[in-house]
């Protein structure tokens, strides 16, 4: 494509719609995240049949993505600080396509596992960079729901994966299930090619004129000097950062505790056991056919999407903390009910397990699901935002890996009922953590949130001097 044609297309994206177009393309990284994590739930039934996998081998196939995602999260934040989120997301799109294609043609379990590790690398890069990109192009009054587009896209990707699983279940077409992700990867990469870097990254790199032009485009304001000065002032109040050791500084530590705590609790409350193993869970509950279990899983996925949309509309109205506390309370109740439903599994009562799963997923979708990704994109100082979010995402993926590697084994040793009771206890701990440690960020600019942490640090210093 000629430079003139590229410039014309970029110019066509000017105006009020530009920020929403940019957010939609960036959020495709979330859709691929959701698809590539969710698709294995239905495909695994047929992969096990073809390759004769043991329980441990099944856990490794599922968790290959999570190992790659952990590695991607480790490098993703620092890479964005150095090269910019847009460039990193372009590379991410290419890795998504390569990983999906390699998974679809894998001739053996080892090749499939390696291919899923590659896919996981892309997922880890997307999970660290898409929320930050969205938070930095969004206006403060709409940042909550725009960043929540990422989680919405994840849930849509999961539903698309479940529908694809159901479509190919009749022919046991697990290769088609895995290979379908190549198409959205191409769209994601094409969209990111035409999007700009974020103003904050550009100003940090000294590209002030480019940052001014980008802000004028995404804010539809002739005068964006006030916002530019606010970003500059935020940078001026910090020493050089962006290194891992900066995360241990006293003024950063409270935000780090919030981010890492939410990262771990989002996973140890068990949500991805439902995403990865839902058909197997439902077969344990009494569903006899693979197709029936997969179809019921689609219903769970639709609830996930619907409640994520509800969260998007409420997050900038009700605030982050109220949604978090109410949603986690719902998770505690539904996990308890789910544990009880597995005490007495039968075909007649199988739908009780489905209803409990839907209630659990609905509660997660208005709380830990979107709000974790939103908060870790908001709460960190600008200079370390990339590396800090990368660290939080790394903890998130490492926790996900541990939970997913142990779920089937826990069910074998303890039973499904006790396993879900265990996740319920973790949810109680997460509610207490949210109540005592998580601040409200609704309606604040990123610079105001940063100032809040500085003021809190100074107040603690003064208290310690008395």
Segment roles from a protein language model:
Residues 1-210, 214-216, 236-466:
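Alpha-helical transmembrane bundle of multi-pass membrane proteins
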Residues 217-227, 239-240:
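Short intracellular "coupling" helices and adjacent cytoplasmic loop segments at the cytosolic face
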Residues 224-235, 296:
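Short, well-structured alpha-helical segments
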């Amino acid at each position: 494509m000629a430079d003139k044609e590229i410039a014309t297309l970029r110019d066509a994206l000017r105006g009020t719609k530009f920020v929403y177009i940019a957010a939609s393309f960036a959020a495709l990284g979330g859709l691929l995240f959701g698809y590539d994590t969710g698709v294995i739930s239905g495909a695994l039934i047929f992969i096990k049949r073809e390759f004769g996998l043991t329980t441990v081998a099944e856990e490794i196939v599922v968790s290959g993505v999570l190992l790659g995602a952990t590695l991607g999260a480790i490098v993703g934040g620092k890479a964005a600080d150095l090269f910019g989120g847009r460039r990193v997301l372009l590379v991410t799109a290419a890795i998504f396509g390569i990983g999906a294609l390699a998974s679809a043609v894998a001739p053996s379990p080892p090749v499939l596992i390696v291919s899923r590790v590659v896919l996981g690398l892309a997922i880890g890069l997307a999970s660290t960079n898409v929320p930050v990109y969205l938070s930095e192009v969004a206006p403060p009054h709409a940042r909550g729901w725009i960043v929540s587009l990422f989680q919405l896209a994840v849930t849509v990707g999961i539903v698309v994966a479940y529908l694809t699983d159901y479509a190919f279940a009749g022919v046991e077409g697990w290769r088609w299930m895995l290979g379908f992700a190549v198409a959205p990867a191409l769209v994601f990469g094409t969209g990111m090619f035409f999007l700009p870097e974020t103003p904050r990254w550009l100003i940090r790199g000294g590209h002030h004129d480019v940052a001014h032009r980008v802000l004028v485009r995404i804010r539809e304001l002739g005068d964006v000097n006030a916002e530019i000065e606010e970003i500059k002032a935020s940078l001026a109040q910090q020493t050089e950062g962006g290194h891992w050791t900066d995360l241990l500084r006293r003024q950063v530590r409270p935000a780090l505790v919030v981010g890492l705590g939410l990262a771990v609790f989002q996973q140890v409350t068990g949500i991805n056991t439902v995403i990865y193993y839902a058909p197997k869970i439902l077969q344990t509950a009494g569903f006899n056919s693979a197709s029936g279990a997969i179809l019921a899983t689609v219903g769970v996925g639709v609830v996930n999407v619907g409640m994520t949309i509800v969260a998007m509309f409420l997050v900038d109205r009700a605030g982050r903390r109220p949604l978090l506390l109410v949603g986690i309370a719902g998770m505690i109740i539904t996990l308890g009910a789910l544990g009880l439903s597995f005490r007495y599994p039968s075909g007649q009562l199988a739908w009780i397990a489905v209803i409990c799963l839907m209630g659990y997923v609905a509660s997660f979708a208005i709380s830990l699901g979107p709000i974790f990704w939103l908060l870790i994109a908001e709460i960190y100082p600008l200079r370390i935002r990339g590396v800090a979010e990368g660290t939080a995402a790394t903890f998130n993926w490492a926790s996900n890996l541990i939970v997913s590697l142990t779920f089937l084994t826990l069910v074998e040793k303890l039973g499904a009922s006790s396993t879900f009771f265990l996740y319920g206890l973790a949810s109680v701990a997460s509610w207490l953590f949210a109540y005592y440690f998580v601040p409200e960020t609704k309606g604040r600019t990123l610079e105001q949130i940063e100032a809040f942490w500085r003021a809190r640090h100074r107040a603690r210093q003064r208290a310690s001097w008395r």
